[in-house]
Amino acid sequence: MNLLDEPVTPSDAKRLILQALASGDVRFTSHALDEMAKDGITQADALGILRSGVVEPGEFVKSSWRYRVRVRRAVVVSAFRSECSAVVVTAWRIR
């Protein structure tokens, strides 16, 4: 159950992502793993992108708020399950 009042600001999303990373509660959907494999993005790469990337404003997609986290050549899309739990929905390399 998601108890967050979403959407959150990009800076709050970054704080929540860092909390999820610190607690070790970042999960990957099967879709994310498939898309990451297609682009040669490892789970470690995705976690690094979440840690160092810039968070864009949330988008409401398929009944949940999703936040793109962008670095120069890749994007990871995450959603929150709680204030300290995140799920990677998809990821891709920018070509």
Region locations from a protein language model:
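Ribonuclease/tRNase effector modules and their secretory precursors
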Residues: M1-R95
